[in-house]
Curated annotation (Swiss-Prot):
Keywords: Cytoplasm, Disulfide bond, Electron transport, Redox-active center, Transport. PROSITE patterns: GLUTAREDOXIN_2. Gene3D superfamilies: Glutaredoxin. Disulfide bonds join C21-C24. It comes from Oryza sativa subsp. japonica (Rice). Its main location: cytoplasm. It is found in: Cytoplasm. Coiled coil: none annotated. This is Glutaredoxin-C15. One of its GO terms (cellular component) is cytoplasm. InterPro entries: GlrX-like_pln_2, Glutaredoxin, Glutaredoxin_subgr, Thioredoxin-like_sf.
Length: 104
């Protein structure tokens, strides 16, 4: 969907979430703790486009619910499991630096 593609490039890190999703909160908190000013889009709070974006993300991720869905430098990284795996392997911070999301 065009809207997800457009929004996913608005900042170095973009996270699609739902307001009632505990794992979404965890992922957003992780990026915040790392000093990333991510763009966060809560799909359930967008009455005009939320459902369409949710379907598009479910198709891209191959699962439902599709949140959280994390994009770094406009590329879909994945959901909680993928983000946490990258972080534990020491690969997330270099990705964020390369994307210009953090400078330290």
């Amino acid at each position: 969907m065009e809207r997800v593609a457009k929004l996913s490039t608005e900042k170095a890190v973009v996270i699609f979430t739902a307001s009632n999703c505990p794992m979404c909160h965890t992922v957003v908190s992780l990026f915040s703790d790392l000093g990333v000013g991510a763009a966060v889009h809560e799909l359930d709070r967008d009455p005009l486009h939320g459902r369409d974006m949710e379907r598009d993300l479910a198709r891209r991720l191959g699962r439902s619910p599709p949140v959280p869905a994390v994009f770094i430098a406009g590329k879909l990284v994945g959901s909680t499991d993928r983000v946490m795996s990258l972080h534990l392997a020491g690969k997330l911070v270099p990705m964020l630096k390369a994307a210009g999301a953090i400078w330290l």
